[in-house]
Amino acid sequence: AGLLRAPAAATLVRALRERFDLPVHLHTHDTAGGQIGTLLAAIDAGVDAVDAACSSMSGTTSQPSLSALVAATDGTERPTGLDIDKVFSLEPYWEAVRTIYKPFESGLASPTGRVYFHEIPGGQLSNLRQQAIALGLGDRFEDIEDMYAAANRILGNIVKVTPSSKVVGDLALALVGAGADPADFEENPTRYDIPDSVIGFLEGELGDPPGGWPEPFRTKALQGRAAKPRHTELTPEQESALATEPRRTLNQLLFPGPTREFEASREAYGDLSVLGTIEFLHGLEQGTEYEAEIEAGKRLILGISSVGEADRQGMRTVMCTLNGQFRPVTVRDRSITADVKAVEKAD
């Protein structure tokens, strides 16, 4: 989150140096805007490595500016050894890349000192804003920040790093969405619909928190729930799959929900990673041709020839081109409201 102040960084690095004969590597985000000072203090104290970001991608929920760090340490006893002109030359490229990913920005136009209050990690802040927008809470982000601080306190001020930070974020979103009073929730948690991630945390799925369990809240929240085993044994099939498909199997074990969604998408649409970033995130422009290499030496030429009018169900016929051949595709235009109600099909 970028909560480590410069004096504390110096104290921490020196203490680690005295106790451990290991490299010390400092990573911090720059949400409040003061972390270049923290890095410099850590460098003076003997840190071995620090993380920084290309200037055009730096600041706020990212890392401090690499250009600033190189310039600040040049001529000192501990320079980075990087050529500052070469570092500068990277900035235009990453500035262009950043415009492509603009929809996923955190929404922070400048540093904010509120991070010292709500303690939302930098990597989570942008994700949390996108989650809030998806839940229709995008215009209540200050309320979510306040509730995040309350949720963090209720859960015992836990160490917030994935996946524990998600637990706090899920609870904050749920309480804001329900219009809940955090004090009442803490006193009477069984009256509320508690997110699964919070229940899992309280049941010990993430291990025992360093500061102990938040009691009596934990006991109240788990009241009437059947205890789950702390560890799940792998089936013979899963053990075999780990040897042959380790990445896919680990995804299924660690993130079952997102993995199912990903595999359903790939089953329906194929491997979309062959598309360019702009085409994938922003769609195809009518009248423009695109190339996609689906395998070594095999390229497809894609395009959109025309887009038909929407019908009462909000469906449009899009005339696509594939290697010069026309292919009609019917898609739902989610920007318009359909007149006909959709009925869920039975299994």
Q: What residue spans do the PLM features occupy?
A:
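Active-site-adjacent beta->alpha loops and helix N-cap segments on the catalytic face
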Residues: 2-20, 59-68
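Short, small-residue-enriched loops and turns at beta-alpha junctions
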Residues: 2-7, 30-35, 56-61, 114
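Catalytic cores of alpha/beta
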Residues: 32-47
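Structured functional modules or segments
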Residues: 343-347
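Terminal or standalone catalytic/regulatory effector modules within metabolic enzymes
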Residues: 109-112, 119, 123-337
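Conserved, mostly hydrophobic/aromatic
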Residues: 46, 69, 148
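Core active-site phosphate/anionic-ligand binding loop and the adjoining beta-turn-alpha structural block
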Residues: 37, 62, 71, 80-137, ...
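Hydrophobic faces of well-ordered beta-strands that scaffold small-molecule active sites
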Residues: 22-28, 50-52
